[in-house]
Regions:
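Sequence context surrounding c-type heme c attachment/ligation sites in exported
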Residues: 23-51, 68, 72-161
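Short, structured beta-strand/loop micro-motifs enriched in basic residues and often containing a Trp
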Residues: 55-66
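Positively charged n-region of N-terminal signal peptides that target proteins for export
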Residues: 1-7
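Bacterial N-terminal signal peptides
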Residues: 8-17
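Sec/Tat signal peptide C-region and signal peptidase I cleavage site
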Residues: 17-23
Length: 161
């Protein structure tokens, strides 16, 4: 019985240490990202397989390190890519931006986030810089979709010539 309790205690202590370590590695909200280089925009409409999670207007932004990564094909540590997702509303025969749904962030640090391809992932709900929607679930919430893009350092987007 003592052995079982000791084993359970060690497992719980290990889980707590892992959780604390993960808590020390949050991806920061990218203040001023809309002043960074705009990479691309797109609209995911009804009928697209990702519409449920990502339907709306997307704008992608890159900091200087990420811009260099797009140019070289290799993203250095410190590269940050922001996925700004807004509702797509129709008005007067035009598709216009509605409320912000989420600000998704990929932050490159090969050592810090080795388990997720060298990228830290986070999503911030709506216009909040503090309401995190990914947290400790980056491996399943984000990286599983990015995993097939290993040859491109797990990045889907490309810059236009």
């Amino acid at each position: 019985m003592k052995r079982k309790i000791s084993s359970i205690f060690l497992i719980l202590a290990g889980v707590s240490c892992v959780a604390m370590a993960a808590g020390n590695k949050p991806v920061s909200y990218p203040d001023g990202y809309r002043q960074w280089q705009h990479v691309k925009s797109m609209i995911i409409q009804q009928g697209h397989p990702l519409h449920g999670a990502f339907g709306g207007i997307h704008h992608l932004y890159a900091n200087r390190a990420a811009v260099a990564g797009y140019a070289k094909g290799t993203f250095p540590d410190g590269a940050v890519i922001v996925f700004d997702l807004l509702e797509a509303n129709e008005a007067d025969h035009a598709i216009v931006e509605g409320a912000r749904k989420v600000v998704g962030v990929m932050h490159r640090d090969a050592k810090r986030w080795a388990a997720t391809g060298g990228w830290g992932f986070e999503g911030f709900a709506g216009d909040s810089a503090t309401n995190r929607v990914v947290g400790g679930n980056a491996a399943t919430a984000c990286f599983e979709c990015h995993r097939p893009r290993a040859a491109d350092q797990f990045v889907f987007s490309r810059t236009r010539p």
